[in-house]
């Protein structure tokens, strides 16, 4: 089974953030911010807004930066994913 997002939504898997600061301080789980770098695992077909087709600008495998608190977190087959709209993606990391 797999997740197939609808419209202009994408499914992402957050990538782990550093647990130690550059100066060597280890951060406890409660002090870490939600990671903002993710990998796209599924992409919806796009959508139509005001009669114009909105194409998807990202593809499976892209690494992206997301807004900190955007999307809906879901658990599927023992994995954690976030489903969000393409507009909540800030940039593609190359």
From Swiss-Prot:
GO terms for cellular component: cytoplasm. Keywords: Chaperone, Cytoplasm. Its main location: cytoplasm. GO terms for molecular function: ATP binding; metal ion binding; protein folding chaperone; protein-folding chaperone binding; unfolded protein binding. It is found in: Cytoplasm. Gene3D superfamilies: GroES chaperonin. InterPro entries: Chaperonin_GroES, Chaperonin_GroES_sf, Chaprnonin_Cpn10_CS, GroES-like_sf. SUPFAM superfamilies: GroES-like. The keyword Chaperone applies. One of its GO terms (biological process) is chaperone cofactor-dependent protein refolding. It comes from the Bacteria. PANTHER family: 10 KDA HEAT SHOCK PROTEIN, CO-CHAPERONIN GROES. Heptamer of 7 subunits arranged in a ring. Interacts with the chaperonin GroEL. Belongs to the GroES chaperonin family. Together with the chaperonin GroEL, plays an essential role in assisting protein folding. The GroEL-GroES system forms a nano-cage that allows encapsulation of the non-native substrate proteins and provides a physical environment optimized to promote and accelerate protein folding. GroES binds to the apical surface of the GroEL ring, thereby capping the opening of the GroEL channel. This is Co-chaperonin GroES. It comes from Ruminiclostridium cellulolyticum (strain ATCC 35319 / DSM 5812 / JCM 6584 / H10) (Clostridium cellulolyticum). The lineage of its organism: Bacteria, Bacillati, Bacillota, Clostridia, Eubacteriales. The gene is groES.
